[in-house]
Amino acid sequence: MVELLHSIKAHNDKAWSVSVHPTLPIIATASTDKSTKLYKLSTKQKFPLVAELEDTHKRSIRSVAFKPPLGGVDAPKLDFLDLPALAAGSFDSTISVWGIDEPDVEYDIDEVVANQKEILTSPNNEWNLMAIIEGHENEVKAVDWNFQGQYLASCSRDKTVWIWETDPETLEEFECVAVLNDHSQDVKNVSWHPSMNILASSSYDDTIRIYQQDIAGDEWSCVGILNGHEGTVWCSKFESFKSPTADSSILRLVSASDDLSVRIWVAKREEEEDKPELPSSIKHTKEMVWEVESVLPAVHKYPVYSVAWSSLTGKIASAGSDGKIVVYSEAEKGKWVIDSVHEGSHGVHEINCVIWAQLDDENEILVSAGDDGYVNLWNV
């Protein structure tokens, strides 16, 4: 059962995207109104506004993404303050990077680290613009950080995927280390694997592309093409190895499309040693062969814009143009069933994004963003 927990009137225009910080109870939103807003996921505090980031982009902000903690979510706890940071991609073709400055005053580091969920989500923190990244020729459609915060991926209507490298501790400079031109049309979404340096991109050309570095760590290239959708692929997300349904020997990915379907793909690897005829430029890259494992039960009547895969339960949520939020669970390997369907989740408006999140009490919820400018929080 999907039940409304809370509704936030976040924006005066379309809410495009929501990002959840991997370790802090905080979300960021993106909107046509050119602003990004941050809210704390606290029922006791009634989901307060933490920060409003504006007056930077000239056009719609299409995507936001929080940088993961240093070393990744599963890294040992740090004995210093790991300050949160956020990237925002805009239709003005640029990406902004925001962060909190470390306090100038002296403080007890042990106390701050122990209470960072409260301290780092306080509305008293000042979020500052740290960088503006330029390179794309047209609208930036999506941004996403890799699991260690070293790489930021972006995609655009210019048909390209860019990978930017930075020092995750300082975020002082962003160097473009790859421009990937494999798609023939507008690229709608990019998404990193939760614990591997593998990137997926989804496109108006009806395909999903998978990218990885060569073994030497020098070049990024396309190592897999997922064909099967009969319309624009709006979104794709990898399954986390933390998921109770995950198999660590394979990779799985869920995708959402204009063709009304939600699909699960599974990867099988081929070693390049078996392909001596390949050019030397990709000789040391592992090719991934992907197959459709299953097509989830048909529910949506209009294009599906967003999917999310829970690392806690293994459940998948989808949402899109028909205003439905659908939750699926895996009854047995490769066999999915519908858990619940919620109609009119944003009234008569389309849903642009759905994502799993944890409240400050660690209960898992769904968060959706719609054309009505609302961000809705759902108990599942």
From Swiss-Prot:
InterPro entries referenced in this protein's UniProt entry, alphabetically: CIAO1/Cia1, G-protein_beta_WD-40_rep, WD40/YVTN_repeat-like_dom_sf, WD40_repeat_CS, WD40_repeat_dom_sf, WD40_rpt
Keyword annotations of the record: Cytoplasm, Nucleus, Repeat, WD repeat
Broad class of the protein's primary localization: cytoplasm
Protein name stated in the entry: Probable cytosolic iron-sulfur protein assembly protein 1
Protein family membership: Belongs to the WD repeat CIA1 family.
One Pfam family it belongs to: WD40
Residue spans of the WD repeats: 10-49, 56-108, 135-175, 182-221, 228-275, 299-338, 346-380
Gene3D superfamilies documented for this protein: YVTN repeat-like/Quinoprotein amine dehydrogenase (2.130.10.10)
Listed GO CC annotations: cytosolic [4Fe-4S] assembly targeting complex; nucleus
Superkingdom of the organism of origin: Eukaryota
GO terms (BP aspect): iron-sulfur cluster assembly
Gene giving rise to this polypeptide: CIA1
General function of this protein: Essential component of the cytosolic iron-sulfur (Fe/S) protein assembly machinery. Required for the maturation of extramitochondrial Fe/S proteins.
SMART domains: WD40 (SM00320)
Subunit architecture: Interacts with NAR1.
Cellular localisation: Cytoplasm; Nucleus
